Amino acid sequence: MGLKSYQKKVIADLTRYLELLNETKSDAAAFRLFWQEKSAPTLGLYQNVIPGVPNLCFKVPTGGGKTFIACNAVRPIFDALPATKTKAVVWLVPSDAILTQTAKALKDTSHPYRQKIDVDFGGRVEVYTKQELLNGQNFNPTAVTEQLSVMVLSYDSFRGRGKEVLKAYQENSNLAEFAKVLGKPDSPIEKADETALFQIINQLNPLVIVDESHHARSELSLEMLENFNPCFVLDLTATPKKESNIISYVDAVQLKNEHMVKLPVIVYNRDSQSEVLIDAIDL
């Protein structure tokens, strides 16, 4: 499955920003220059959500293929960042239903999402759920240095202090080898054991993809994002919040032109020409 023309534009926008980031070595300067090139300098005010961490947003309507766009964004992001021993992706989703759907698609080697990532990373890809990570199932220091590790996780299983969240903070003998290999963390998580899953992910310095990111703007959500110790944050949403650093917009008309969505035809009777003109301006 190839990218639609509007999806190609999103990836092109990302690629241009990454080029500017490498030239300027500044998240904010690259963002400002990007929108200056688009003749829209007023859009170039960068919101420093996590200091020192690039944070971008794709604004794509529901049904626009956000997940497939994100799959195509992983390789360009890693290519633009400094080389590291490990390549890890935390793919955050807002609900159990989306978690199941996303994990199933990314684990299926015949699915276009997984096929794209496999092509970009030479088939050396492993996709994990939280339980598989907690169990250390094919998740060890050797594996993560030889593959792209994609961890599909829900906000609620790492946000707050609930029973399910605490599992990620607790001592975990299944992951003890990581603590030996990775050593003391540079960014230790408060109240997390050095063998805890959350702390291990933190030390892998992952790319974090936030699906439906408008649900992840509370203080607890931002604390969660910081604890992941991301190298880059990519937000996906149809309804971005004001602090989002939107790098590419897709509107419903572009989806309609690509036959991705059918827009309804709504007809109203108006009593005068002036009312018609007023409604047209409002629309």
Write out the residue ranges for each language-model feature:
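RecA-like P-loop NTPase motor core of helicase/translocase proteins
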Residues: 1-283
